[in-house]
Every structure is written in structure tokens, then in C-alpha cells.
Amino acid sequence: MTTFTRTITLVCYGSIALAIVGVFGTWRTAGAVSLDGLEGPYNGWLVIIFALIVIAGGRSLSRGGWLGIILVAGCAGVMILTGVEDLSDDVLGGRSGWGIWLTIAASSVLAGVAVYSGVKRVRGSRRGEPRTSP
């Protein structure tokens, strides 16, 4: 396992762990009421489901496989969208909590890792010289 592969794997799994921790953290506070990502109108369960799917594609992403890159990028996009949508949906009033911000930030790092791996894969697959026939 190369240093790059190990680093991508650690960042990927660390981001997944932080996103799940964020789901169980405070997403909205209104007075004495505090809700996490699984309570009330929030869709934190989607973040958990897609984070578990990303675990399956994490190794493929770290090796630079297209299936892993696309899987992680798509799941991270859904995780970001879920957090941003719940953040902008101000049904209860009050203010946003640390959990929703942690979930959005960790999901954004996960998407960034997928984009970085995709760019590295594309740049690494180009040849320096034009191909000639034998």
C-alpha cells in the first residue's frame, strides 16, 4: 500500500466517521429544544445510509478505480445536499447547531477527495508522447 493510497483511505474513512458523528450532534436549537439529524424533519438517516455505501467504495477510490471515484463523489453529493437542504429548511426557527455544520464539512472533504482522485487518475493516464503504429 503506497503512501498516497493510505492517505486517501484515512481521509475517506475519517470524513465518513465525522459525518456520522455530525448526524448525532445538534442540527437545530430553538429555545430549550435541541434536535439532532435523526429527530424532527431532518434527514440525517440519508447521510448515514450513503456514508455506509461510501465505505464499500473507499478502497476502490484509494486505488484510483473509476467505480469508487464515481460512487464516492455521488454519495458525497447526496450527503452535502441533505445537510444544506436541512440547513436552509428553517421550519422550526432557532439557529443551526454544530452537528449539521460538521456533517456538511466532512461530506465536502469526502467530495474533494473523490475529485482529487479523479483528477489524479485522468492526469496519470495520459501519455507523454503520441502513439505510433509499429
Task: Label every PLM stretch briefly.
Residues 1-134:
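Compact integral membrane and secretory-pathway proteins
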